[in-house]
Amino acid sequence: MATTTCQVVGLLLSLLGLAGCIAATGMDMWSTQDLYDNPVTAVFQYEGLWRSCVQQSSGFTECRPYFTILGLPAMLQAVRALMIVGIVLGVIGILVSIFALKCIRIGSMDDSAKAKMTLTSGILFIISGICAIIGVSVFANMLVTNFWMSTANMYSGMGGMGGMVQTVQTRYTFGAALFVGWVAGGLTLIGGVMMCIACRGLTPDDSNFKAVSYHASGQNVAYRPGGFKASTGFGSNTRNKKIYDGGARTEDDEQSHPTKYDYV
């Protein structure tokens, strides 16, 4: 029951994280215009992985897709690739994990095969979550670098009053898509870890010792009392031996060395 619960929870978390990764990849607000100390408030700009948008104060929004691939920054293309790879791996992991559920029986599939499928889906989810987190973090680092470079250019020394002249430049800060991507990547990563933990519950324990068959009556050993009879030298020893209940073993089987009751 614990294994099935762990599988289901891991699958649901990974499914939710995958949906968040898809939503974050398609969102336009990866970077939004920083309105702090900005005299121009009639126009609000924001950019995504696939297009840039301009929203006017009247509510009209115009988006323009990126019509080039080679002309885009290399970091932006890397973020695109990471997010797409994470989504593809997440979809494959979802399909594998559905068939790996312990509560679903498909033909003669045993638990060892389900354990391998569960481990595979868990690894796929972990890689998918890592790709999403790395992609979002790379884009965030690019935003931070550009932000401080723009800030330095705004207050560059160009003479004038106090030797400082402030120029108006558009600075971008974190958008909502970054936070969605971070949360989605974390959920996918946690779901993958739970699937890997559930794999241990499906793996047969090979460290157990092999079972040894024995007679149940051997636990309570009782003796049959009997006297001793003198034997002749021509026949076998006719004395009564202590016999164990539940088996054909006699006292000679248990003790082979001579005793004081042996006669010639």
UniProtKB/Swiss-Prot annotation:
Per its record, what are the GO molecular function terms? identical protein binding; structural molecule activity
Residue numbers spanned by region Required for role in regulation of RANKL-induced osteoclast differentiation:
198-264
InterPro entries xrefs: Claudin, Claudin18, Claudin_CS, PMP22/EMP/MP20/Claudin
Please give the residue positions where the record annotates the modification Phosphoserine: 217
**Keywords tagged on the record:** Cell junction, Cell membrane, Membrane, Phosphoprotein, Tight junction, Transmembrane, Transmembrane helix
**Record's keyword annotation contains Magnesium:** no
| Annotated Basic and acidic residues bias | 242-264
Q: How does it sit in the membrane?
A: Multi-pass membrane protein
Q: Where in the cell is it found?
A: Cell junction, Tight junction; Cell membrane
For side Cytoplasmic, which residue ranges? 1-6, 102-122, 198-264
Knockout consequences: Parenchymal expansion phenotype and overall lung enlargement evident from 18 days post-conception (dpc), as a result of increased lung cellularity, airspace enlargement and increase in the number of AT2 cells in the lung alveolar compartments. Increase in AT2 cells in S and G2/M phase of the cell cycle with no change in low levels of apoptosis in the lungs. Increase in bronchoalveolar lavage fluid leakage as a result of alveolar epithelial cell injury at P3 and four weeks of age, resulting in an increase in AT2 cells in the lungs by four weeks of age.
A single GO cellular-component term on record: plasma membrane
- Give the start-end ranges of region Disordered: 241-264
Conditions for induction: Induced by 17-beta-estradiol in bone marrow stromal cells, osteoblasts and osteoclasts.
Q: In which tissues is it expressed?
A: Expressed in the lung (at protein level).
Query: Topology: which residues are Extracellular?
Result: 28-80, 144-176
Q: How does it assemble?
A: Interacts with TJP2/ZO-2. Interacts with TJP1/ZO-1. Interacts with YAP1 (phosphorylated); the interaction sequesters YAP1 away from the nucleus and thereby restricts transcription of YAP1 target genes.
Q: Which family does it belong to?
A: Belongs to the claudin family.
Function (record text): Involved in alveolar fluid homeostasis via regulation of alveolar epithelial tight junction composition and therefore ion transport and solute permeability, potentially via downstream regulation of the actin cytoskeleton organization and beta-2-adrenergic signaling. Required for lung alveolarization and maintenance of the paracellular alveolar epithelial barrier. Acts to maintain epithelial progenitor cell proliferation and organ size, via regulation of YAP1 localization away from the nucleus and thereby restriction of YAP1 target gene transcription.
Further comment: May act as a tumor suppressor, inhibiting the development of AT2 cell-derived lung tumors.
Protein name, UniProt field: Claudin-18
